[in-house]
Amino acid sequence: MIRKLKFSALGVALTCTLAALSGTALAQSTIFNIPSTDVVAKKKTYFEFDFIGHLESDKNGGFQTYVPRVVFGLPKNVEVGVNVAATHSAAPAIVYVQPNIKWQFYANEKAGTAFTAGAIAYTPLKDRKTIDSFGLLYANGSKKFSGDHGARLTLGGYGVVDYDGAGANGKKATKGGVMVGYEQPLNKKVSFVADWFSGNNALGYVTPGFSFALPKNGLFNIGYSVGNRAKKNNGLFVYYGITF
């Protein structure tokens, strides 16, 4: 059981959600797990609540992770935010605070391209002597293809700083890799979306699912995360986001 970058409980719930629909006017900071090339607009706020769970009893490896997150848009295409990820399982509860920053340093709407770079810090609220603090650095780019149903493809790379955890199979964790995202509008309100972090670490998951545009700048995503390694390293992933 890994938790999103965290390591344990589905990669601390997929690293507690690093947490954009190409087919809508909405922008979100992540697809499912990987960062998108979107940033929150200046003076806007994005709020999101994630649930990630392996739907078995705790004694059989089940867990539930809850992740509220808020992101603020700043000048010069910069956003800053914070996530709080709490995981319940048979093991002691894990709570991570994750301040983060992203900079969209290039965007060409006509060409459908954008590039971003960012960083996320992961710090446990308790048990700091036994649970690692670490950081994530990344850069990525995206290409939005033309047409009413034009897909967006995102490619990038990441590195984990000061992380000494084991991989999902008990072997030494990898400290870097690639990330891939795909967003395919099906109609004006629904898109098929998927993303993947390579690596044998808390980030190493593939998550396919669907994204639904809601009224008043809302968004609902539902998918299923499957770990790159280990049995039962998977979980339902649901989130709601809104920009205001």
PLM feature spans:
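Transmembrane beta-barrel domains of Gram-negative outer membranes and organellar outer membranes
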Residues: L26-L153, G157-G165, E183-S191, D195-F197, ...
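Short loop-to-alpha-helix "cap/lid" segments that border enzyme active sites
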Residues: A173-Y182
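Conserved phosphate-coordination/catalytic loops
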Residues: G61, K172-A173
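Cleavable N-terminal export/targeting peptides
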Residues: M1-I31
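Solvent-exposed loop segments that connect transmembrane elements
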Residues: A166-K171
